[in-house]
Amino acid sequence: MADVAGTSNRDFRGREQRLFNSEQYNYNNSLNGEVSVWVYAYYSDGSVLVINKNSQYKVGISETFKALKEYREGQHNDSYDEYEVNQSIYYPNGGDARKFHSNAKPRAIQIIFSPSVNVRTIKMAKGNAVSVPDEYLQRSHPWEATGIKYRKIKRDGEIVGYSHYFELPHEYNSISLAVSGVHKNPSSYNVGSAHNVMDVFQSCDLALRFCNRYWAELELVNHYISPNAYPYLDINNHSYGVALSNRQ
């Protein structure tokens, strides 16, 4: 396994194992009717903030993505310490806290949710008041032109999840995201079936290549899937996990 700059194999594998253990714990302890939503926020310094929310029959998210400096204060320079793992803050551009840009701004957000979620509203706000214009969001969705509101994630012809991805205007230094939905059929839904978030991960092969004049220091090359069904980002041509095209 090649090193990401400033990150040893041992550090990376240790973080991978902790994440995998946590996911397996959550997955194995899931109850019927679970609803899963994963939110990825991509920052201008290369940081990725990942938030997962599970609930019974309904899901409600109200998260504010702020400059990551608030999470870094008082922390050690260890690239992937337990605090960061627990807070779901990762530095795929090297992991060195000294490389962190205090003026980091969210540049894009991706939402992946299971088909058991009937999403009613997705609202964005600048600060706590101004909403992102609908026409801007429509321009940000490469699949909007086809009339599909969300990109469908399929496995063996069956829809196993949906992806909602958009970039943010350059002046946004914080973003509030609210997602609400209800379970479509709680009486028959079974997390042990193909309709679970682990299968969603195994099925998504998203091209997240973007770079504009406001954010020229990072390019997300591809979305990779690990053998353990945890999605990794291929940053600056450092590949981890297994691309779907190479899966057996």
From Swiss-Prot:
Its main location: host cell. It holds the Pfam family Cypo_polyhedrin. It is found in: Host cytoplasm. The keyword Transferase does not apply. Keywords: Glycoprotein, Host cytoplasm, Late protein, Signal, Viral occlusion body. Residues 1-27 form the signal peptide. Glycans are attached at N28, N77, N86, N237. GO terms for cellular component: host cell cytoplasm; viral occlusion body. The sequence of strain H is shown. Major component of the virus occlusion bodies, which are large proteinaceous structures (polyhedra), that protect the virus from the outside environment for extended periods until they are ingested by insect larvae. This is Polyhedrin. It comes from Bombyx mori cytoplasmic polyhedrosis virus.
